[in-house]
Design a protein with these regions (language model features):
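Charged DNA-binding/catalytic regions of mobile-element recombinases
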Residues: 1-177
Length: 177
């Protein structure tokens, strides 16, 4: 397995004093790195498309040789992920879509786990968020910490960014040898 082979995506709701907001994520399965995320006040297709676009941008700005061709994007069967606009966005990016079975949370277990960590480590620790802007600021801070400092047992107790860096170092060393 390698980075940019398989991604998972989903979103969750978060209560604020201004009403519900929805936070969506896109995670690289290999490294557990959150590549894209977004907070919006509605759970429409633009929410998940913007996360897909952010994940692509994250890779394109840091990986000279990045291509989305052959990448698999897995999500649940929610209407946002099965919409024509989203499937066209996947196709236009060269990404293969994968949809889980209806009502099976285990089908997207890695994403459910990441959302569980988000809820436990950020949302549940906050008494209340004033609105979308505060939730967005706090989420940005949490995502940075999650990607650069949080240790993950599944990847050798390393943060996702470090784990990806090790992969790329090993790949370069193998190419030189």
């Amino acid at each position: 397995m390698r980075p940019d082979q398989w991604r998972v995506a989903d979103f969750t709701y978060c209560w604020t004093l201004a009403g519900f907001c929805y936070t969506a994520f896109c995670v690289d399965v290999y490294s557990r790195r959150i590549l894209g995320w977004r907070v919006m006040s509605s759970k429409t297709t633009p929410l998940v498309i913007s996360v897909l676009e952010q994940a692509l941008f994250t890779r394109r700005r840091t990986a000279f040789r990045f291509t989305a061709t052959g990448l698999i994007h897995h999500s649940d069967a929610g209407s946002q992920y099965t919409s024509l606009a989203f499937t066209e966005a996947l196709r236009d990016s060269g990404i293969a879509g994968s949809i889980g079975s209806v009502g099976d949370a285990l089908d997207n277990a890695l994403m459910e786990s990441a959302i569980g960590l988000y809820k436990t480590e950020l949302i549940d620790r906050h008494t209340t968020f004033s609105g979308r802007a505060e939730l967005e600021r706090e989420t940005a801070s949490w995502v940075h910490w999650y990607n650069t400092q949080r240790l993950h047992s599944a990847i050798g107790y390393r943060p996702p960014v470090e784990y990806e860096h090790l992969y790329h170092q090993q790949t370069i060393s193998a190419e030189v040898a």
